[in-house]
Amino acid sequence: MAKIAKRVQKSREGVDPAKLYGLTEAVTMIKERATAKFDETIEVAMNLGVDPRHADQMVRGVVNLPNGTGRSVRVAVFARGAKADEAKAAGADVVGAEELVEIVQGGKIDFDRCIATPDMMPLVGRLGKVLGPRGMMPNPKVGTVTMDVAGAVKASKGGAVEFRVEKAGIVHAGIGKASFDAKALEENIRAFADAVIKAKPTGAKGNYVKRVAVSSTMGPGLKIDPATISAA
């Protein structure tokens, strides 16, 4: 515990909590401070000027990060027949219909992302209380209810990241690993930020992107100047 506390304290040295850093400087500093014995996840958080309690201020979507996430994603697909075969051929880890629903209802969730064909949704709908709180319920708005199961599986395994604003108006995601080079992390952060900006809801008024911060699993958070994150 003492070693961990010492490492955390050291990682905060030279960090000005009041400063707005440029993206390039922030990424460099975060990488330098990611000194844990595992490959730390780099996460970006955006505080938005929305109130998600109102339907016209909900922010959600999916973005394909250009350099992937650096993590292995297990994908489950609810499908039958030819579509089930397509999912398996595309690399899905778990494929099934009624039997898969029973497995999930029994509490076994051995996957990170869930895809379904439209005809399966009446069946998958029974899993709302199980998958919903985990953010894994298939949804056509983010491409996880689709007939193109092969494309969805490949996207999920290739760096697709879903995002959804939380109650406090914050949207966040893991966008890579500390082992990524700085350019790859910057490109991923910009891709994520642009997707969130493009998902601006009609009900959002005033300043949409209020604050942006980047951090590693065990490192400090650095505030970023929002003007430096957009690729547009």
Swiss-Prot record:
One of its GO terms (cellular component) is cytosolic large ribosomal subunit. It comes from Sinorhizobium medicae (strain WSM419). This is Large ribosomal subunit protein uL1. One of its GO terms (biological process) is regulation of translation. PANTHER family: 54S RIBOSOMAL PROTEIN L1, MITOCHONDRIAL, LARGE RIBOSOMAL SUBUNIT PROTEIN UL1M. Gene3D superfamilies: 3.30.190.20, 3.40.50.790. It comes from the Bacteria. Belongs to the universal ribosomal protein uL1 family. It holds the Pfam family Ribosomal_L1. GO terms for molecular function: rRNA binding; structural constituent of ribosome; tRNA binding. SUPFAM superfamilies: Ribosomal protein L1. PROSITE patterns: RIBOSOMAL_L1. Part of the 50S ribosomal subunit. Keywords: Repressor, Ribonucleoprotein, Ribosomal protein, RNA-binding, rRNA-binding, Translation regulation, tRNA-binding. Binds directly to 23S rRNA. The L1 stalk is quite mobile in the ribosome, and is involved in E site tRNA release. The gene is rplA.
